[in-house]
Amino acid sequence: MATPRLTPEQIAQVSGLVAKYVATQCERSASRAIPLSVPQRALMGGFFSPLLIDETRLLVLQGEWVANPDFYPMLRSLGFNNLPDQSAMAAITFCDVVVSHGPFSNGLLFHELVHVEQYRQLGIPRFSGLYVRGFLNGGSYGAIPLEVNAYTLGGRFEQNPANRFSVEDEVRRWIAEGRLQVCRWN
């Protein structure tokens, strides 16, 4: 089934709801989250700025799952039947707090740190708007340009973790080139 078309006002409303959800989950999770471990910091150093590594916090849930947003029923009533299930995600990044449903693999941590960098450069409102528009345009989680960026950079990391590159520069380049934008819904 095709993704329902929303009006610009509805897109703005959903983007605002997503931004509020992200900010709330970040605040709710921050007190329980911990810094990256020494081995994680060593592995991710050279890809991410020292400041990003210092400020990011991780939370591995045990026996609990991240709940879907309260606004999902409203979206389902509009015809959305393929919304990402938060409890089925390996991890979810809420600005600078990464919440995982299990232990972090190196690849998963890298992917989520790319999202931390995206939030750092875009801010929560713009990240949320791009995420919503990306989902609407592509019709699925995997087609969201922010996810494509994270998976692309993660693939480079997993192919050769010894080949360091600046994620900050790569995200900045994708933003400058408009690769995180989507035409149909902007």
Language model features with spans:
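Post-HEXXH active-site segment of zinc metalloproteases
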Residues: F94, P103, G107, Y119-V148
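Active-site metal-coordination segments of metallo-dependent hydrolases
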Residues: A30-V38, G138-Y151
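Long, well-structured alpha-helical subdomains associated
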Residues: N160-N186
